[in-house]
């Protein structure tokens, strides 16, 4: 079984889509082994997205991710990283396939509803950023 980090971002949370996104996660056969609702500070958002530091969108990303509550989760499934990325859809909701979370719940490139780890190394860092080993079922 593989693990990946998933985030329901502040835009989707504020719009009341957390329940619909969680329902899809369970429907697709993921096991949620850790979940927290939290509000990130700009410093926490910067630490999480440190790989984007220096890029033109970094300040907007920090501001957005600290703009309201979000839900962070650890998902477990066979091939969890690819499976979650497929369910999320393309980064830009305008380019996302029908039936994906970003197509259904995202509104723009910067407000695309969900986040997911892109590789095993990234998943290990991201899961560890929000969860200690004892936090996971």
UniProtKB/Swiss-Prot annotation:
UniProt xrefs under InterPro entries: NDK-like_dom, NDK-like_dom_sf, Nucleoside_diP_kinase, Nucleoside_diP_kinase_AS
GO biological process terms, semicolon-separated: CTP biosynthetic process; GTP biosynthetic process; UTP biosynthetic process
One GO MF term attached to the UniProt entry: nucleoside diphosphate kinase activity
Pfam families membership: NDK
Record localization: Cytoplasm
Phosphoprotein keyword on record: yes
Record's keyword terms, sorted: ATP-binding, Cytoplasm, Kinase, Magnesium, Metal-binding, Nucleotide metabolism, Nucleotide-binding, Phosphoprotein, Transferase
Catalytic activity: a 2'-deoxyribonucleoside 5'-diphosphate + ATP = a 2'-deoxyribonucleoside 5'-triphosphate + ADP; a ribonucleoside 5'-diphosphate + ATP = a ribonucleoside 5'-triphosphate + ADP
E.C. no: 2.7.4.6
Classification via SUPFAM superfamilies: Nucleoside diphosphate kinase, NDK
Cofactor needs: Mg(2+)
Positions annotated to bind ATP: 9, 57, 85, 91, 102, 112
Annotated GO CC locations: cytoplasm
Active site, UniProt feature: 115 (pros-phosphohistidine intermediate)
Record CDD domains: NDPk_I
Residue pairs linked by disulfide bridges in the UniProt entry: none
Major enzyme class: transferase
Task performed by this protein: Major role in the synthesis of nucleoside triphosphates other than ATP. The ATP gamma phosphate is transferred to the NDP beta phosphate via a ping-pong mechanism, using a phosphorylated active-site intermediate.
Record-stated family: Belongs to the NDK family.
Subunit details: Homotetramer.
Protein name: Nucleoside diphosphate kinase
Gene this chain is encoded by: ndk
């Amino acid at each position: 079984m593989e693990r990946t980090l998933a985030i329901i971002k502040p835009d989707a949370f504020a719009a009341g889509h957390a329940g619909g996104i969680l329902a899809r996660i369970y429907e697709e056969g993921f096991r949620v082994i850790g979940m927290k609702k939290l509000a990130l500070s700009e410093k926490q958002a910067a630490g999480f997205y440190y790989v984007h530091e220096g890029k033109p969108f970094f300040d907007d990303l920090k501001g957005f991710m600290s703009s309201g509550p979000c839900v962070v989760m650890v998902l477990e499934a066979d091939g969890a990283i690819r499976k979650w990325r497929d369910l999320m859809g393309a980064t830009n909701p305008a380019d996302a396939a029908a039936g994906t979370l970003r197509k259904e719940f995202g509104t723009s490139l910067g407000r695309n509803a969900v986040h997911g780890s892109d590789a095993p190394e990234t998943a290990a860092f991201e899961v560890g950023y929000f969860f200690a080993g004892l936090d996971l079922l």
